[in-house]
C-alpha cells in the first residue's frame, strides 16, 4: 500500500517509521526544509536553541522510549537532574527537583499539616481509578468529568499544595492558568510520579525526528513541500503538493489541527472540521538570552519557577545544565518561558524586555547578552480544557476510510503524545479491526521489516 503522511513533526515521523516497518510505501511531506516541527533546533553563533519542546519525561513516555530503543538511540539520551528553585511572591526561594514531585514536600513554606494533606491526597490518587497512560487521549477522556485542574488540585492537594506544586509545575509545562486545564493529565502524572526522569537527546529534542527519519529506510521524504490539497481518487486519494499530484491508497494527516481542517474540508462533514478548528491553542513565547561567557558559573539550580502567576513569565531554564552541548564552551543561555495571558498585551519588544528583567531577578547582574532570540507562536501549545479529550477522540470515527489523523493535540502538547498518536494512526491503517494497544510489545514483534 502507498501511504502519504502529511507533516514532519514527531507524529508524522512516527507514523512514517511505523508504516515502513509494516512494509508500506511511504511519502512524507513536510512544509519546512527540515523535520521536527516545534521540536526543531535553531543553530546560531555556536548555540543550539530549542524552538519549543525541552525534554523527554522518562517512564511516562513509554512509546517514545520503546521506539528509541528499537532505533538503538535510547542510551544516547542525557539525564537532566532539573534541580529547581520555587520563587515565592516575597522573593524567598525553595528548592526541589522537577522530576521528583514528592521533593516539593521538603519546601519549608509547607507546614507539617499541609505536607500531610498533600501526602494524603497523593496516596488517595494512587489507589483511585485513573488514566494509566498520560498521553492516550481516549484513556484521558474516560477520566475527564468536566472538573478543571484548579478545583481538582485545591480539593486533592489543598491551597498550599496548589500554590507551590500544581501552579509552578503545570505553569512550566503548559503556561496557562490551571483553571483552563482538565485535571486528567496531572492526575495521571501524580499516579506515576515515581516513573518521571528527565532526559534530553545530545543535539536537543529535535534529534528525535532526525533519528526516526534516519531509521526509516526507503522513506520518500519531501522537504519544503507543503500539501495543498487532498482529493478522493477512485479507491484512493490524490495528494497535491509542490506542484505535483501524488496518487496514494491512504493518507495520515499529521499537521496542527487548523491545517488538518483545511486539508480535510472536502472529505469530512463540517462538524468534524469545526472540532479541529475549535481545538484550543495558547499564545506561546519564550526568549533565549545568550552569553558566550557564563555570568553565573556557580549557580546550581537548572530551573526557576514562580509560585504564582503574578509575573509575566512561568519558567527560567539554564541551557548549559539542560543540554550541555547546546552552548559554546564557557557559555550560557537562559530560556525564559512566558505565561499565555500576559502575551495578549505585550509586543515582541515587551517580551524581550521582560525576559531580560527575569534573568536579572533570578540570576543577578550580568553584562549585556551577546544576543537574544525570541520564539513567539500565536498558536503555540494545544490546551486540553475540560471536555477536550472526548471531543478530539471522537474525530477518529468520523474520518472516511483511508484517512487517519495524528497529532499531540489529541492529548497534550508533547513528544510522547505525538509519537503515540502517529504510531496509533499507522496501526489503525494497517488493521481492519480495532488495533491492539500500541504500547504492547506485540505490535513491535509482529512488525514486518521493509
Regions found by a protein language model. Give the residues of each.
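Dinucleotide-binding Rossmann-like beta1-alpha1 core, especially the glycine-rich loop
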Residues: 45-132, 137-140
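Glycine-rich FAD pyrophosphate-binding loop
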Residues: 20-44
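Conserved Rossmann-like nucleotide-cofactor binding loop
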Residues: 11, 34, 258
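Short loop/edge segments at beta-strand edges and connector loops
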Residues: 7, 79-81, 223-225, 231, ...
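N-terminal Rossmann-like FAD-binding beta1-loop-alpha1 element of flavoenzymes
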Residues: 2-28, 430
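Active-site/ligand-binding neighborhood in enzyme catalytic cores
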Residues: 124-230, 234-236
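Mid-domain catalytic core of redox enzymes
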Residues: 22, 228-349, 362, 442-450
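Conserved flavin/dinucleotide-binding core of flavoenzymes
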Residues: 98, 316-450
Amino acid at each position: 500500500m502507498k501511504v502519504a503522511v502529511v507533516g514532519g513533526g514527531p507524529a508524522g515521523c512516527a507514523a512514517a517509521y511505523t508504516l515502513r516497518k509494516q512494509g508500506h510505501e511511504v511519502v512524507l511531506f513536510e512544509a519546512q526544509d527540515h523535520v521536527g516541527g516545534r521540536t526543531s533546533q535553531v543553530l546560531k553563533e555556536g548555540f543550539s536553541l530549542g524552538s519549543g519542546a525541552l525534554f523527554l519525561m522518562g517512564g511516562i513516555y513509554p512509546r517514545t522510549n520503546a521506539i528509541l530503543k528499537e532505533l538503538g538511540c535510547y542510551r544516547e539520551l542525557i539525564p537532566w537532574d532539573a534541580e529547581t528553585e520555587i520563587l515565592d511572591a516575597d522573593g524567598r526561594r525553595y528548592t526541589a527537583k522537577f522530576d521528583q514531585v514528592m521533593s516539593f514536600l521538603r519546601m519549608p513554606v509547607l507546614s507539617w499539616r499541609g505536607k500531610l494533606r498533600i501526602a494524603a491526597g497523593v496516596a488517595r490518587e494512587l489507589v483511585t481509578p485513573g488514566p494509566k497512560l498520560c498521553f492516550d487521549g481516549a484513556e484521558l477522556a474516560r477520566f475527564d468529568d468536566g472538573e478543571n485542574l484548579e478545583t481538582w488540585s485545591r480539593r486533592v492537594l489543598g491551597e498550599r499544595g496548589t500554590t507551590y506544586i500544581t501552579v509552578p509545575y503545570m505553569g512550566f509545562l503548559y503556561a496557562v492558568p490551571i483553571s483552563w486545564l482538565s485535571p486528567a493529565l496531572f492526575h495521571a502524572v501524580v499516579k506515576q510520579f515515581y516513573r518521571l526522569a528527565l532526559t534530553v537527546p545530545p543535539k536537543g529534542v529535535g534529534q528525535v525526528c532526525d533519528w526516526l527519519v534516519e531509521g526509516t529506510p526507503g522513506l520518500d521524504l519531501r522537504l519544503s513541500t507543503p500539501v495543498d490539497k487532498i482529493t478522493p481518487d477512485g479507491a484512493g486519494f490524490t495528494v497535491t503538493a509542490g506542484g505535483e499530484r501524488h496518487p496514494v491508497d491512504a493518507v495520515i494527516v499529521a499537521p496542527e489541527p487548523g491545517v488538518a481542517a483545511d486539508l480535510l474540508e472536502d472529505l469530512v462533514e463540517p462538524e468534524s472540521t469545526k472540532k479541529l478548528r475549535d481545538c484550543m491553542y495558547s499564545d506561546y513565547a519564550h526568549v533565549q538570552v545568550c552569553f558566550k561567557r557564563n555570568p553565573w558559573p556557580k549557580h546550581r539550580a537548572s530551573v526557576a519557577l514562580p509560585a504564582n502567576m503574578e509575573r509575566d513569565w512561568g519558567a527560567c531554564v539554564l541551557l548549559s545544565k539542560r543540554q550541555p552541548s547546546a552552548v559554546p564552551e564557557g557559555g550560557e543561555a537562559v530560556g525564559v518561558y512566558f505565561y499565555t495571558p500576559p502575551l495578549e498585551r505585550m509586543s515582541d519588544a515587551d517580551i524581550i524586555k521582560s525576559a531580560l528583567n527575569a534573568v536579572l531577578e533570578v540570576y543577578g547582574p550580568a553584562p549585556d547578552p551577546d544576543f537574544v532570540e525570541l520564539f513567539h507562536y500565536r498558536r503555540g501549545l494545544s490546551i486540553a480544557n475540560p471536555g477536550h479529550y472526548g471531543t478530539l477522540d471522537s474525530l477518529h470515527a468520523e474520518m472516511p476510510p483511508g484517512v487517519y489523523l495524528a497529532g499531540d493535540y489529541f492529548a497534550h502538547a508533547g513528544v510522547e503524545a505525538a509519537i503515540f498518536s502517529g504510531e496509533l494512526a499507522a496501526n489503525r491503517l494497517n488493521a481492519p479491526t480495532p488495533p491492539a494497544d500500541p504500547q504492547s510489545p506485540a505490535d513491535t514483534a509482529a512488525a514486518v521489516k521493509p
